[in-house]
């Protein structure tokens, strides 16, 4: 079986373990930096190139960093269109990184969670803050992971200032009530 591991670096522990295990089991295996892949999107003939040569695999194992979800998922989708099986589908990669979608589904299912607001226009910030509750507020970048892009604001004014600052760079943000029992854990 021809196996492609889509990763930024073979030196990453998980990538090197996958590579060694696949080789040990007799698979023709290659680690490919998905950021260095480029695609040719044409009628009925999707193609992917890496370092100047066309590549194709029977199976791909995506190791896509959160920062590169959009591009990484596009590369995986192109392999899927070429007939490769993927350990994680392009759709599942995209969905798993969509915090807003996950929160909407969790909230709709009745699971306890912090009250969360989402707003597009700056003029509606104060209104959405009131729907979330009273300060403190947790302000989160939708694209942030592992605690990056999270701000705790103690007052409504501080929350408005933080949100307006994030909005200046067209960031999508979530506003959540602060749950004191969480001890600062997300």
Task: Annotate each predicted stretch with a short phrase.
Residues 7, 118-120, 140-143, 154-155, ...:
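Short, structured patches in soluble enzyme cores that scaffold and shape functional sites
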Residues 1-87, 101:
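ATP-binding N-terminal substructure of ATP-dependent carboxylate-amine bond-forming enzymes
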Residues 4-6, 61-62, 88, 114-116, ...:
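Short catalytic-loop micro-motif centered on adjacent basic/acidic residues
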Residues 150-186:
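Phosphate-binding site of ATP-dependent enzymes
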Residues 27-34, 76-149:
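A conserved helix-loop-beta module that forms one wall/lid of the active-site cleft
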Residues 52-54, 130-132, 142-145, 166-167, ...:
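Solvent-exposed alpha-helices and their adjacent loops that cap or buttress functional pockets
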Residues 68-70, 146, 182:
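Short glycine-rich, flexible loops that bind phosphorylated cofactors or substrates
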């Amino acid at each position: 079986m021809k196996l492609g591991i889509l990763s930024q670096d073979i030196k990453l522990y998980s990538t090197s373990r996958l590579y060694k295990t696949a080789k040990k089991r007799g698979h023709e295996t290659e680690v490919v930096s998905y950021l260095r892949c480029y695609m040719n999107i044409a009628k009925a003939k999707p193609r992917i190139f890496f370092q100047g040569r066309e590549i194709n695999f029977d199976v791909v194992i995506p190791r896509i960093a959160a920062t590169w979800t959009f591009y990484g998922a596009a590369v995986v989708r192109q392999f899927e269109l070429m007939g490769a099986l993927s350990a994680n589908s392009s759709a599942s990669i995209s969905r798993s990184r969509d915090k807003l979608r996950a929160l909407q589904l969790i909230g709709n299912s009745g699971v306890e969670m912090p009250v969360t607001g989402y707003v597009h226009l700056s003029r509606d910030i104060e209104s959405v803050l009131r729907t979330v509750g009273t300060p403190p507020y947790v302000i989160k970048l939708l694209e942030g992971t592992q605690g990056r892009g999270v701000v705790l604001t103690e007052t409504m004014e501080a929350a408005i200032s933080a949100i307006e600052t994030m909005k200046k760079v067209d960031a999508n943000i979530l506003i959540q009530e602060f749950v004191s029992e969480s001890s600062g854990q997300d």
